[in-house]
Structure formats: C-alpha cells, structure tokens
C-alpha cells in the first residue's frame, strides 16, 4: 500500500515503527524521486526505534478524530467564556473571580493538550507559554470589561446566537423577539462644557506708574481657557472718584485670539493661559468690568484693583544763592511728590567725596493710608474711597552746617512711593561717563572760606608815626580761615577818630568816621595819613563776612619836627681850674634817634662831624686835640621821622679858646622800662661823690620838660618817684646835674626811657556767628573766643554765673597767650569775665562783651505716639493684641536734630520654646517713624528701643530704654481626627450615633464653620456649629444639611475666643466623606403603572447590594435576587405585576412595599428633533433639551447622561434620570457635560427602552454607577 495520502484526505498519521527507509515492496506504487546524487544509507548500527504514541491509542480513536474533539472542546470553552463576558456586560461590572477562573481553565487546557500527544498537536513548551500569555491577556480584557475596537461586532454576532433576558415569570426570553424597533426613540443632545474660562487683571499686583519717560503702563490681563470677544475695564479717577469704562479694541481682541490659538494644544478648545498687556495712559484704579467669551457668556473674573499712580518724583527747591560761606547753613529744601509713604535717597558730594543718605516714611502730617502698615486688618481698604492713592507733595528740609570749603553738591539719586514704584536717577559716581543729571535734581554750592584780618606791626603800644603831610599803608594782615592765604579781593571797613577827640582811656571819642577800602589782592593796603585811632570793624570777601582778630586798633601819630637847643660851658681840668674844652649840652625835641651834623673849624681847617643821639638829651664834650681857637657850627638836626632840618643862627655857633667832678647814675640795666597807664615810676639813682648831694633831673613828655631839684641828699642812693603817669606815651627821665659837698656842679647825661601804655589792657568775648551765644554738644569742650589787648600773656579771671551762689560765683583763672585766644570751658551756663591782667598791667573788662552764654543742643528724644491701639503701662507701652499674621504697628515721635538713627531690639517669646532676639535699625529725617510690628509667629513680642542718635549725639548717655509689648495670638486650628475616613449614616437619625471627631487648638470657645460639598451639587453648603468649649468635638451635622449619597466635609473656617480665625487657605487639609443611606427601598424608574408587552419593568433599589425582591404576577408569588441596585424584568405577557417587599445586605430587613404595574401596547420619543445635536457651553451655562413625544400623555421618560465620545475613548454613562411630561414636548435645562439620550419612554399605557442596546453599544461603562435598565 502506498504511503502517500489520497487527494483531499488528511495526511497520514506518522507511525513510530516506520522510521527507516521504505522497502521496495512498500513503494511499488509510490512516485519515484530521482536524485542526481543520492545520499548514502545510514549505518544500520545507528538505527533506534522510538516508542512515542498518543495517550488515547489510535486504534480506539484515530488521530483526526482526536484533533476534532480537541478543537471542538476549545470552541466550547470559548463560547462559555464569551457567555461569561456577556454577563459582565449585562451587569456592567468587573469580575476578578471570572478572570482567575479562565486563567486556570486556559492553563489546564493549554498545558494539558501536549500531554495527550495527539498527532500534529504536540505543541512545544515555548509555543504553549506564548499561547497562555495571549489567552491570559484576552481573559483580562474580557473579564475586566475593557473595551476593544471590534467589541460591538462581537456583541452583535453573539446576539444572533443569544438574546435572552429574564422575564417576569423568571424565565429567559429573547428580547429581540419581543422588541426590535429602533425608530421609537431617536436623537440625542451632546453638551460640551468648555474649559472654565477666567480673566484676571494683574494677578501679581505689580505696581505701575505714569510720568516722566513712562508715557504708558502695560497692565497684564490673563485669560484662562477663553477667547474674549468683549473686554471692559473700569477706571476710577483718584481725584474725582468718577468711573470710566474702557473697552478693548477689535484689533486688540484679535491679537488675544491669535495668541490663544497659538498657545492652544487643541484646535477646538482653548486650554492655555494667554497674557495680554493692556496699555494705559491715565492714572487711576483699574479693575475688570465685563468680559464676554466667544459664546457671549460672561467669563469668571477676579476684580482686585490695580493702581496706576503718578510716578514718584523729586526735585531740589531753588536756592537764593549758590554761594555759601564756611559755617553757613545749607538752607536747602527738596520736594517729593508721589503716593505716600515716600522714600528718597540723596547724595551729598563734598569736593568729589560722596555721602549718601536716606529719608523714609515721608508723608503729610495726619495722612492715613493702608500702605503705611498701621492697620490691624489684612491690608484692607475701601474701594469707594481711594483718594489716598493720589500723589501728594511732601517737603524735606535740609539745614546743615557747611563745615568745609569747596564744591558742595546735593543730588537726588532715587525716589520710591508707597506702592514700590522706584525712579532712579543715575549719579556721576555710579556712571562717570553718563549724562549729567537735570538741574532740578541737583543743587550745587560753592562754599568759600571766610576772610580773617588783623593789624600787623601796629597796636596801641606801637603806634604808626608818620611825618606831617605824609601817608602810610595801614598794616593789614589778610588771610582766609584755615590758615590759607589765597590771593583774592576783599573789602574792609574801619572806624577813625582824630587824635584830639580820643578819650582819656585812649578809646574813640564822640567824633567817629567810617572808612572803607576795596583791596585788589591780599597785598593791597589802604593808605592813611590823618593822625588818630584806626579800628578795624569788618572784612568781607566773595560775599563772605570775615573775622576781625586782635590787634584791631592802630594809632597814627604826627610827631613834632626835631628841634635842637645848645648850652655849653668850659671843661676845667679841676673843679676850679682851666678849661680844656667845651662841654655842650644838646637838648632835642623830636623822635629819637637823632642825627646832629656840625662843622669844626680848628685853626683855619674845616671838617664835618656827625653824632648819633639816641635820646632827647646829649652832652657832647668837644675837647680839641690841639690848643687854639676852635669854632663849632651845628648845621643840621634830624630824627627817625624827619630828615635833616637845617639849623641857622648864632646860637648854633660855638667858639673856644683852649685851658672830675660829682656824678650820678641811673640804676637800670637797659635804660628802658615800661609802665602802666596811671602808675607811678620809681627809679633808683646811684650818687658818686661826697654827700650831701644836690640832684637835678627832668621829666620830658610830648615835648614838654618838667625839671626837678632835690637838695641835701645824705645817702649815696636815691629813689626818684614820679607822679602818676596819666598820659600814655614815651617819657624820658633825665639826670641834668649833680653837685656834691665841694660845691662843684657837674652836668649829667644819664637818661631812662619810660614807655607808658596809652591804653589799659582790655578783655572781651568775641562773637560766634555774630552773637555771644553758642549751642554745643553736651559734654564737649567749647572754645569761647577772646579779644585781648595789651602785652601777653594775660591772666583772665572768669566765672560761671550759674555755678555756685548767684552773689558770689566761683572765679577761675586762665592764662591766655594769644590776643585772639580761646577760653575753653566744659560746662554750660553764663560765663562772665571778671578781671584781666596782662604781663604787666591790670586791665579793664568790656561790660558789653563780658558775658558769653553756653548751652547744650537738646539731646534727641523718642516717645511712642498714643494712637489707637497703643496704651501706656507702668513698664512702657502695650499694643493691642492681634492675631498671628495680621498687620500691626505703631509710631514713634522723634525730637532732636535730624537725621535720626534708632536702634531697637525685638524679642519674641513664643508660646513654647526659647525666646529669640533680633536687632534692627531705622533711619529717618521726619518727626515720626512708623514701626512695623512682627506678627509672623504667635507669642509675646517686646520692642526695646536701646539707642537713639541724631546728627549731633551718637552716644546713649541719658537715654532711657522704651519698651513696647504686644501679644500675638496664635490662629486656631481644627483638623479631623480620622482624615480621609468615610462615615456612613442613615437618612433617619439613629440613637447613639457617633459624630465626626475633630481636634481644635486655640482659646475656647470655638466657632466652627464646615463646608459640605455634595458630589451632585454645584455650590457647597455651609454649616456653622454652636460655641465649642473644649478642644475636642464630635461634629454631628443635622440631616437637613446632608443629601443622599456621598458628600465631602471640609473645615472651612474656625474662630476662637481671642477673636482670631483661620480660613480654608490655612486649614486646607484632608477631608472626610459622609455617605447617607436610606432604608432599603425600591423605586420604579417610571411612575406609570401601565406597560406594554415587550417593555422592561425597571426599578431602582436603594441600599447595599445584593437585594432580594418579592413580587406577585397574575397571583403567583415569586422571589428574585438582584446583585446590584437595578431590578428589571421583561414584560413578555400582560397581567398584574406587584412588588411586595425588598431587602438589602446593609439593612438586613425586609421593607414592605406595594408597587403594581399593569402591562399594556409602544410610545415614541425624539430628542433634538431626532438628530444628534452638539452644543458648547461654559460651566455654569444651561442648554434647553427638547423632548418630543408621540403617544398618549402623560409621558414619562428616562434619559441618560454619558461622557462625550472622544477619539480612541468610549463614552461612559454618568447618570440616569427620569421625568414626566403632560404635553407632547418638554424642555429640560441641562448644565452638565455629556451626551443626553432617552433610554426609556412611557406614555399613559406603554413604555419603550433602548437601554439594553445602549448598554451593549455604549462602550466602556462607568464603574461607579450602575446602568439603570428597564
């Protein structure tokens, strides 16, 4: 028999024994295959027969039959699997048990099939593994009800073989045989909720300002998921409060639309945030008004005010003059304009060195603004009154002493308003290559040194002597303060009194004239010629008044012309012997030294001689060397002022033909002495010879001689005591002659020059800034300027009239070495000069300038302003208690010399833990400063002001710390003890029912506010608890605040006994769920009692599945089980159908009911004219859904809302609703997204439902909501 199978037959089953080559007898009918190169036969020794046979022998069941049975068994398993899948679809659920079941069955089948060793089904192990994985995946898709693309085709194919449901009689009936009429229910309404659109103006509340270079301000408007077609802004004017409506132009709206489409990820739906910068050119408060989207619906918007204010600016007020002198005040004002409180930064550059200063919290007196941080609420303001945002002008005065010369420049660098708008003006120090600042931002001064003038080489003791008719420069020494001697022009003025009008004390008399002179340079001097007293009164240079230093007075004298008188006698060799020469007495009038010229003619020879005479008297011994006739002719006499005056007359000619004694000496080493005005002079005289002596002497003053003779002097020493010298000037005391016992009178030439002061030493206080009063920093030494005349050093006696007894103040002595010296004192009071001595004479004190008042600059003072919320306590001040995070503060008043520097400590004592300390410093120039209180953490804050400095005082001596305290209460908190837990309650309240436990922190009593959000409600409901007196509480919400189903409970607000509260933003946290159940009941999805044959009678069960339902049909009582909340039966025959009772798993009770249905013939309904209509709305909008009924009213219908089908996704049924209409049409308003379709319709007698079809064609179902079927 041939081994080749017949055509069309199964291949021949291989036999294990037939492994070797075919024998010739076995292949007689086979086709011979010719080989060009036949293979050699395998060795016989290598042949081994294998014994592999099927488990079921082939002689019992051949191989094809075994393969057929295996394939049939696989098809049966597949059909069973598809049946289980249809049950999953019918129940719209998932089954993990079915998945495990089919995983096990497929595993046994696939791994057991190869073990049967059926020919051609001997599957390899890898193939079985891959096949099992594919089956497991297929089981997962089916049993977990996961949609797949060809699912509907499979369902349709299955419906051909299986389309049966349970009827009222509890038998399966084929639905398609009863109901196959899709035209009865037509149409659907698709509502698409557009993304929630919103618009917000300036969400970050950025500050904007207009002014200067900022002509426009671009305010950002953010549009979220919307394309606006109309945008309106409301502008409120700061000045008038009137509102103005501004609308975006069409071009601007088109720009927004282009941006939205460019940013959108979906071409049909806007999902992005679009920013549009709206330019404004007017100041005011802006907010969004009306915003409409492309569907003419109003877009949700937030309306915070955006303030566009005038940009802050500052300028320097005009100064009367750009010139200043050292010691002058700057007298400068700056004006700051903007929305208070303002800040300004300015720099002061002195000779290229920069100094920066800050002024803060600048605002008008009494100005109140929410920007000042002095309110206790969270930056609240009245939108009806925004006048505080208008620009205000605040002057800032600078009045500081300009202590150094050079170029001073004040420059404004930066200004900032209360909203944080900053205008910077670049300074030359920051940008040397930049443009200079405008003139209104700077003020430059040229501070010049003050001139200093004094007389040099002339005073009352050393007058100027000038010949009559001649002039001389007033010896002015000119310079500038600081010791420099810059060349400059200057003007001086002086007082002049003629010499004959001076008082006895040498001061100016009644006749006083004023002289002025403008010097071209510092070497130029005025010329004077009139004799008298010159006293400097003022000096000025470059518009700066200068200082007059001592000596300031000069006396100009015209001395007498020199005159000479001669007396002569012969010189005997003994008291009474022959003459050996002439002794000539020269008596001179004039100003020594003198030069006397004479000619000598001896024995016919003539020669000229010259003698220098230092005084007014001189004895010239003319002793010729040779005997004879000698003639002496005196020709000229001159002094230090006048040149030689010619002498003529016989009295100046002496002739002689040529033939010791008593003496007297003046006991003085130098021959010169000084005396005080009005004092007596005592001169010691040494007499030589034999007493008794007769002494002749004379006193010469001002050209007048007064001779004296003292006889009978018995001692060899004698004191000449003059009368008081009441007239100042030069006196000459000369000894004229002396005679001793022998009677010989001898001529004497001894002289003593006595210089008598023309004025007594004088002491007075100088002036500081034109007055004898000064303010100084407390504790510092003060140098009081003195003006002294006389010969130094001086002893100045002074007293502080405020020190000691008023009648006898304590007198102190001070030695002053300079006539323009200083009296250094270290206390304050009224200092008076009581007496003065110079190096020789007692002086006088100028009564008009004998007193100088010294007082301290007031030390800076700090006090806390007792405004609202600030109270005085024994230890300091107490601020009103605030809550954690609130804004609070207080004001401090400052007195002194600005700018001020205040240092203070902030110590925080928390409710628990250790305290913390921080140090802060503020600088200010105005009299009030706002201190921002720290309320970031709960506890007690202590503000201790430890140091206060102003422009004068940098020490804290005498400053008493000020303490301000404030209690910051912690914000209360509330939280669920079991967050995230679900609490189940029945609709009717039960006894001993547990509440929702809540833990609270804070100060009792508490007032709690919770938010109840039902999943089907658009707006949450608010429930407020009564007062809670403990920190733990069980929340029991009344039933009228709850709805059936699940609701989320969230704590929204809590307020405690201290007045503090926390909002949802702070209390955001886990919520709890509350599920409210009713007792198990059953409700018909339709209220009608008449049905038509072929309809499903559907009920909704409330409670917890599974349910048991008892009912009667045509007098027969039946019991049915429902694994879910849906209970339905097919009305396959007419009759009375009555539900008698129902029970569920949760209640475990049987609730009696009586629901009777009468089965009757099918109504029709069309939704949206029988078409599929799509409408796009915004959330919160509504759509009218039109239902048209055909049948006998009234109509009851059930419709579903499903998710809208999207590409690659199946829609899900979200909810099922039923309604009633007594007309042939009905409009229902819908606001939720989804596809609305009628699944059941009922008229007066009949009803029709397509839910079974929907359930099979709707794709993937919602796993949380059971589909309600009829």
From Swiss-Prot:
Topology within the bilayer: Multi-pass membrane protein
Topological domain spans for side Cytoplasmic: 1-67, 117-126
Polar residues bias: start-end ranges: 25-35
Gene: POM152
Region: Disordered, residue numbers: 1-45
Motif (Nuclear localization signal): 756-763
Keyword Repeat set for record: yes
Pfam entry (one): Ig_Pom152
InterPro entries assigned: Ig-like_POM152, Ig-like_POM152_1st, Ig-like_POM152_9th, Ig_POM152, Pom152, TMD_POM152
Biological process, per Gene Ontology: mRNA transport; nuclear pore organization; protein import into nucleus
Membrane-spanning intervals of the chain: 68-88, 96-116, 127-147
Protein name: Nucleoporin POM152
Keywords attached to this entry: Membrane, mRNA transport, Nuclear pore complex, Nucleus, Protein transport, Repeat, Translocation, Transmembrane, Transmembrane helix, Transport
GO CC terms in record: nuclear membrane; nuclear pore transmembrane ring
Main location (coarse class): nucleus
UniProt-annotated location(s): Nucleus, Nuclear pore complex; Nucleus membrane
Assembly, per entry: Component of the nuclear pore complex (NPC). NPC constitutes the exclusive means of nucleocytoplasmic transport. NPCs allow the passive diffusion of ions and small molecules and the active, nuclear transport receptor-mediated bidirectional transport of macromolecules such as proteins, RNAs, ribonucleoparticles (RNPs), and ribosomal subunits across the nuclear envelope. Due to its 8-fold rotational symmetry, all subunits are present with 8 copies or multiples thereof.
Record function comment: Functions as a component of the nuclear pore complex (NPC). NPC components, collectively referred to as nucleoporins (NUPs), can play the role of both NPC structural components and of docking or interaction partners for transiently associated nuclear transport factors. POM152 is important for the de novo assembly of NPCs.
An example molecular function term from Gene Ontology annotations: structural constituent of nuclear pore
Perinuclear space side: 89-95, 148-1270
Domain of life from the UniProt record: Eukaryota
Keyword flag Chaperone: no
